[in-house]
Amino acid sequence: MRGLFITGTDTGVGKTEVTCALVANARAAGLDAVPMKPAQSGVAPGEPTDADRLHAACDGAEPLEVLCPYSFAAPLAPAVAARLEGRQVSFGAIVDGVRALAARHEAVLVEGAGGLLVPLTEEETYADLAVALGLSVLVVARAGLGTVNHTALTVEALRARGLVLTAIVLNQACETDDPSVPYNPAEIARVTGREPLARLAHVRDIAERQRFLRSRLAGKIQF
């Protein structure tokens, strides 16, 4: 299967923004790539969702419910949100759904929720999904204080499961005067053995930010 698994060191680090940029760049280059986000939570009626943005990034190449089969109201890990709603997330159905997309398209970019060890089902985490799909992993991390530890832990967890690290992207998702930001890329490279591919500065306007992300990531990540 051709594609990529996008995880984060935490929630709110910009996984969806990065995934949208990668999908849009791939499609602009002539590659039929689609995103897939198995589950999203914290969905409010009438409000735009991560799945909506991913759907737009691939020009509506697949129905929204195919690109994101599970949506939950509570802003919790999918397994917990499903439990509160009396529902179950089917790991097998998700794996089958990704493989079906891979059969119809040239590449599938699968976006997790939160971090690598977030419970997707009552038994499986997102790390288990990456293993089942055989996809290499892109880690999106915060740019600021604490990211060295969070990134190192994520890289250690994926390597322990035999997963291949494609790249680390440091994303400054909000404005900050954090003094650690200039030093974190080199320190992450030292402790993980992998230099972060890019440090993405904060851009307030959403449309302009997506253009910026696309330009910074263009041609840098292969899948």
Curated annotation (Swiss-Prot):
EC number, UniProt record: 6.3.3.3
Binding residues for substrate: S41
List of catalytic residues: K37
Entry binding sites for Mg(2+): T16, D50, E111
A GO cellular component entry from the record: cytosol
Annotated PANTHER family: DETHIOBIOTIN SYNTHETASE
Annotated function: Catalyzes a mechanistically unusual reaction, the ATP-dependent insertion of CO2 between the N7 and N8 nitrogen atoms of 7,8-diaminopelargonic acid (DAPA, also called 7,8-diammoniononanoate) to form a ureido ring.
Identification of the protein by name: ATP-dependent dethiobiotin synthetase BioD
Organism: Anaeromyxobacter sp. (strain Fw109-5)
